[in-house]
């Protein structure tokens, strides 16, 4: 598999991966679509489920995060790095938020497979997750 950096250069390190995950969590928790999209390479891809086509390009990812910011409140995000190679980082992640409407408390628990370029921007993000929801009474 070809690497994104110079020959033999380790593109994904534990430090670059954790830094990216911290910035991703901050963008989500603050509901900042510009910051979220800015974490991706201009031609980056983001696949939120193995059953849907990935979003391609920073603009498509930005549009997705605009919708997220409109429909989620009180977001909390955490992660645990599981593995890092020169090409990919793998992390377990979890998040909780209130989905609006219909005002449901939502928890997600999932896995990220992420590749970064030499500048620390995400070239591709694939995720798998499970959801637990409880509906608030009116």
Regions found by a protein language model. Give the residues of each.
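A beta-strand edge to alpha-helix "cap/lid" segment located at domain peripheries
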Residues: 2-11, 16, 32, 62-138
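Short alpha-helical functional segments enriched in proximate histidine and acidic residues
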Residues: 27, 39, 68
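Short, well-ordered alpha-helical segments enriched in acidic and aromatic residues
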Residues: 30-45
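Solvent-exposed, amphipathic alpha-helical segments
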Residues: 16-27
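Structured beta->alpha junctions
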Residues: 25, 50, 81-83
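A short gly/proline-enriched turn/hairpin at secondary-structure junctions
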Residues: 8, 45-56, 68-70
């Amino acid at each position: 598999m070809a690497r994104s950096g110079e020959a033999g250069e380790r593109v994904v390190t534990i430090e670059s991966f954790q830094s990216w995950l911290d910035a991703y969590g901050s963008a989500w928790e603050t509901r900042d679509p510009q910051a979220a999209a800015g974490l991706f390479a201009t031609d980056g891809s983001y696949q939120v489920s193995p059953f849907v086509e990935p979003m391609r390009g920073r603009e498509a990812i930005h549009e997705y995060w605009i919708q997220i910011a409109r429909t989620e409140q009180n977001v909390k995000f955490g992660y645990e790095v599981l593995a890092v190679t020169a090409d990919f980082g793998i992390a377990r992640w979890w998040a909780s938020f209130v989905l609006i409407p219909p005002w449901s408390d939502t928890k997600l628990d999932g896995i990220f497979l992420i590749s970064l370029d030499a500048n620390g921007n995400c070239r591709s993000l694939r995720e798998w997750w499970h959801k637990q929801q409880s509906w608030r009474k009116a």
